[in-house]
Amino acid sequence: MALIAIGGSVGAGLFIGSGAVIGLAGPAAVVSYVLAGALVFFTLRALGEMVVAVPAGGSFSDYARLAFGPRAGFMIGWGYWWMYAVVVAAESVAGATILGGGVPGVPGWALALLVLLSMTVANVVSVRVFAETESFFSMVKVAAIVAFLVVGGLWALGLWSGSGGSSVANLWQHGGFAPQGWVAVLAATVVVLFAFGGVEIVTVAAGESAEPERGVALAVTNVLWRIGLFYVASIAVVVAVLPWDTVDAVRSPFVAVMEHVGVPGAAVIMEVVVFVAVLSVLNAAMYTSSRMLFTLIRQGDAPRFLGGTSGRGVPVRAILLGTVVGYAAVVADYVWPERVFPFLVSSIGAILLILFLVICASQLVVGARVRRREPQRLTLRMWAFP
């Protein structure tokens, strides 16, 4: 559980989407990741207070329902399902972008269709795919990012053989630290949120453990470490090694750094790791969207026939419905191949921002209600809340 909590949702949002963030904010992309990370961190603490005080069966929409009524629960529930359906689409397009480097003659839409079909079949055949693969995927991603930080950090400081001196000046050369202005840095923060999608699931899962207070506190701490080490530090390495205006918005800057450093085979290995990360998050998104649909059915907000399962207990209909947006993205990738992925990333970031704001608003209402009626249940409190 701890390993999945640290590396589970690291996918295209970091490995590929960071290129678009750097293109918007320049070296100040580091600030965008810090701002988004702070928003996520405090949101998880607010969510953690509600999870411990008022267990809601793993559904964020339940807290919106408790705070603002059934309509709010309905909107947040379907909004959350829609977000993960879009994540399925984004990760499929990202996987196609990576595969396209090895088979340049094949169009991106065909590769996106191949990735999406393969993962759909894998999830429909066996419900155990998620549990059996996610821990391994997380281990690969954690190891790869640590290696990237070591190699890239040494190169940026001029301590790597053949580096030719420190490249840290890339942080303020080429137009300055925030070459596009600070408004662009704030705009990039919304795109950054895509990279943090999934961290909220771990908090709710920890709340369902035998010791919810300890589990939630540990989950939030793990997220803090991940924000600092995986996101902020790795982006700092990228913009220190590469001039920001050479970073491709649709190609992994992590691979570009390894190519720049020139370690034999490192770029290929990183390309494989990025592809594994994309498959990992695509796998998790299919699982999560189907689980969210079951929650909507339980609440009476979705038709019951969508909850049908196969003889092996696989929620086939829920999984297939969660891939509909992905197949629409395949068509869009055929028509607008250069615009699909940035659009999907921005859409996911906007949905997550709304979700996080609703979680915080729900905590204000639910938290105040619990403080008045059952203050003894507040064993885990939101910081700075009266």
Features from the language model and the residues they span:
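Helix-loop-helix junctions that connect adjacent transmembrane segments
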Residues: 29-30, 107, 139-268, 272
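TM-loop-TM module centered on a large, flexible mid-protein loop between adjacent transmembrane helices
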Residues: 62-64, 69, 100-101, 219-285, ...
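Membrane-interface loop-to-helix entry segments
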Residues: 96, 109-166, 196, 220-224, ...
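Extracellular loop-to-transmembrane helix junctions
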Residues: 16-111, 223-232
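Transmembrane helix-loop boundary segments of multi-pass membrane transporters
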Residues: 20-25, 30, 94-109, 129-138, ...
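C-terminal membrane-solvent junction of multi-pass transporters and transport-like membrane proteins
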Residues: 1, 133-140, 306-316, 353-386
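Membrane-interface "cap" regions at the ends of multi-pass membrane proteins
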Residues: 1-18, 23-28, 41-45, 57, ...
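Membrane-helix boundary/coupling elements in multi-pass transport proteins
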Residues: 15, 56, 79-93, 196-209, ...
